[in-house]
């Protein structure tokens, strides 16, 4: 009998579903690394680079290989200490981000710092998110940006999750992809990264139902990529300047879902570099989210089995303050209105803060004016006016607000 040269069905499925690598990822050349100085300085020197908030910074700088060994060790220990001491109160996305950061690579001792205990804790938090969706009209405890981080971390660190459930909840068109009826580009981008990881981790042991789920995941990914590209602006940005970094990552890992003429990567990169020179990334979270893409990296490059790459003399971290550009017309103070929803009870307030403030400043001012109403927040709904320029994306909200659980509609039980 002649031997068959046909691939097994599952092998063929694997071959057809895993996208080819893009021929060119438009990272910044080594000759232009100095253009990244403002980002590095912002991340390392910021007053918000503390505790769990440092996870975003650690992840970004590790992917870029910019930290010295001592800086890496110091920042890793800071994130680990904050994670372990506050884990019960962390949102699922915060814990996922910490796991990605401390497990992004292994240190000189050859050990990855991410523990199986943290991964199990994330599994439980993710299941709590799913349960809340089932009980509250599809609303997670946090939002889809954080749910995507959950799936990504569980996927990369061999946590437990249901492929079928992932395929079910991440359908395109789901209301959780939208913020004030506007598609959230960074939420969609994070979902693409998570779905791509799930798709690439399939094995021969998957059953027929899981194969169907994988096919759905492929279709979901393609739809989300198309939605991201639909948000492309004339100047090359994907959504806006703050969502562009993670959107670039999403497009890096999904080149088979769009044509080359649909996206000019170099145009996007050059626009981002121009924005950096104008001081667009003054917050460490924003800087951390844009840096990996400029280095040609994505969160899928996280690998707990790979040795960390440390900075060399070819890149000098500047201690100079990042450039800050003030608009021609800029009032010294702005008025911000927001409302807090706790168990369907709504508290509203209006506070005045200096122009350029972050949302954490708004909350601190509200607490000063009425500590009884605003000192403890389990859930928030943000109605943005004066700070609209500052918070363009879900990812940014996770930056200075790491100690809060921000949900799509502020519904937390």
Kindly give the residue locations of the regions a language model identified.
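Buried hydrophobic core positions in alpha-solenoid tandem helical repeats
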Residues: 39-43, 79-83, 122, 166-174, ...
